[in-house]
Amino acid sequence: MLELRHRGGCPGPGGAGTPPPREGEAAGGDHETESTSDKETDIDDRYGDLDARGDSDVPEVPPSSDRTPEILKKALSGLSSRWKNWWIRGILTLTMISLFFLIIYMGSFMLMLLVLGIQVKCFQEIITIGYRVYHSYDLPWFRTLSWYFLLCVNYFFYGETVADYFATFVQREEQLQFLIRYHRFISFALYLAGFCMFVLSLVKKHYRLQFYMFAWTHVTLLITVTQSHLVIQNLFEGMIWFLVPISSVICNDITAYLFGFFFGRTPLIKLSPKKTWEGFIGGFFSTVIFGFIAAYVLSKYQYFVCPVEYRSDVNSFVTECEPSELFQLQNYSLPPFLQAVLSRETVSLYPFQIHSIALSTFASLIGPFGGFFASGFKRAFKIKDFANTIPGHGGIMDRFDCQYLMATFVHVYITSFIRGPNPSKVLQQLLVLQPEQQLNIYRTLKIHLTEKGILQPTWKV
């Protein structure tokens, strides 16, 4: 985000200096008929020009406090800072992984709540950085409108999800039917109300700055809400499409750190001086192997491979189905050189294992660029971490900067190469039609199946 500077030797707000008169402006006020817009532009230039300044002009965000538990500090007090950070990161990583396994055990609904909670926290961390940088300018309604827009965008995206995956539940509730039927109009009306509130909150001194912060909020919404929505869409395709990509990113993060910590010598990128080629390459091979094994293990269980569906008869999410061909063992011919090494011509694999190679490759080669992007953002504001939520790790956004990029790739991958027509969704749409429309579809479908020879023609006597 760009920062304020002052033109023409005019000191900041509250300073004693005055700007030089503009061309054609008399000292005695002979040009009182000059347009108000020109005067407002001059004020905007004095107080809101955010361009053409060096990094030294960026105000430093107050440093985050250390939240490492005291008992952990005392236990590691004799170690160097390098090894102290190693142990803190390691202990907290194992703790988070254990909690993640617990949430997986609790089911897909808890995973959805976890994704929403992470989304809100990431949004709060990014918005807080903007507020800390510009809090001295007392922007009216900035934080209130930011959270209002978050609610509006969430309503827009997740209203669509409710309509798609909870159709049977919605049909039983009159109030929900109204919200779903007019969902897009309600979403637009809510956003329009926030837009009008923003326009009404504009203040002369801060026009340009307020528009910068308006853009800040919307870019933050684009990063957090849309990506978390894609994560939940992936989860509905089957928990395996959620777990393998996320765990691949986590594996790459851990193994790249380990390889870099012990073997790192060659810097990888200037944005992150601690990143090394050794860590990057070691993380790549480790992640591909991990993803391949994880795909094999998870493909065995319906709990992970079946699409998540809401069943109205049991009033809960279920993961029961006949696994698709993607999750059924198939024989594949080995290349000649592997046949010589393994002394066999074929190998049994789940087709999803082959897809996992693409997912793991993206997680290890492209995913880290999400982290590099976040590093550049933090360098721009002279901060080490987005927050201090997790000792040794920083904020929640520091842990999920690569996950958001991964979520988009997985969603595009599924829609491009995997997803076909969903019979349950088609049936849900048919059930909400009028009886006459349903009969017309039935007759058309019957004629179509008869012409294809699937149904025997019925002869009228």
Swiss-Prot record:
Species: Rattus norvegicus (Rat)
A Pfam family that the UniProt record links to this protein: CTP_transf_1
Pathway stated in the Swiss-Prot or TrEMBL entry: Phospholipid metabolism; CDP-diacylglycerol biosynthesis; CDP-diacylglycerol from sn-glycerol 3-phosphate: step 3/3
TM region(s), chain numbering: 96-116, 149-169, 183-203, 230-250, 279-299, 357-377
Record-level GO cellular component terms: endoplasmic reticulum; endoplasmic reticulum membrane; membrane
Listed Basic and acidic residues bias regions: 22-56
Role description: Catalyzes the conversion of phosphatidic acid (PA) to CDP-diacylglycerol (CDP-DAG), an essential intermediate in the synthesis of phosphatidylglycerol, cardiolipin and phosphatidylinositol. Exhibits almost no acyl chain preference for PA, showing no discrimination for the sn-1/sn-2 acyl chain composition of PAs. Plays an important role in regulatinng the growth of lipid droplets which are storage organelles at the center of lipid and energy homeostasis. Positively regulates the differentiation and development of adipocytes.
Tissue specificity of this protein: Brain, retina and testis. Found in cerebellar Purkinje cells, pineal body, inner segment of photoreceptor cells and postmitotic spermatocytes and spermatids.
Name by which UniProt lists this protein: Phosphatidate cytidylyltransferase 1
Presence of the UniProt keyword Transmembrane in the record: yes
Cofactor or coenzyme needed: Mg(2+)
UniProt keyword annotations, A-Z: Endoplasmic reticulum, Lipid biosynthesis, Lipid metabolism, Magnesium, Membrane, Methylation, Nucleotidyltransferase, Phospholipid biosynthesis, Phospholipid metabolism, Phosphoprotein, Transferase, Transmembrane, Transmembrane helix
Gene Ontology biological-process annotations: CDP-diacylglycerol biosynthetic process; lipid droplet formation; phosphatidylinositol biosynthetic process; positive regulation of fat cell differentiation
Activation/inhibition comment: Activated by GTP. Inhibited by CDP-diacylglycerol and by phosphatidylglycerol 4,5-bisphosphate (PPI2).
Gene Ontology molecular-function annotations: phosphatidate cytidylyltransferase activity
Subunit comment: Homodimer. Interacts with FOS; this interaction may enhance catalytic activity.
InterPro entries noted in UniProt: PC_trans, PC_Trfase_euk
Cell location: Endoplasmic reticulum membrane
Major localization class: endoplasmic reticulum
Sequence segments annotated as region (Disordered): 1-68
Residues that bear Phosphoserine: 35, 37
Entry EC number(s): 2.7.7.41
Catalytic activity of the protein: a 1,2-diacyl-sn-glycero-3-phosphate + CTP + H(+) = a CDP-1,2-diacyl-sn-glycerol + diphosphate; 1-octadecanoyl-2-(5Z,8Z,11Z,14Z-eicosatetraenoyl)-sn-glycero-3-phosphate + CTP + H(+) = 1-octadecanoyl-2-(5Z,8Z,11Z,14Z-eicosatetraenoyl)-sn-glycero-3-cytidine-5'-diphosphate + diphosphate; 1-octadecanoyl-2-(9Z,12Z-octadecadienoyl)-sn-glycero-3-phosphate + CTP + H(+) = 1-octadecanoyl-2-(9Z,12Z-octadecadienoyl)-sn-glycero-3-cytidine-5'-diphosphate + diphosphate; 1-hexadecanoyl-2-(5Z,8Z,11Z,14Z-eicosatetraenoyl)-sn-glycero-3-phosphate + CTP + H(+) = 1-hexadecanoyl-2-(5Z,8Z,11Z,14Z-eicosatetraenoyl)-sn-glycero-3-cytidine-5'-diphosphate + diphosphate
Membrane topology (UniProt): Multi-pass membrane protein
Stated family: Belongs to the CDS family.
Omega-N-methylarginine sites (modified residues): 7
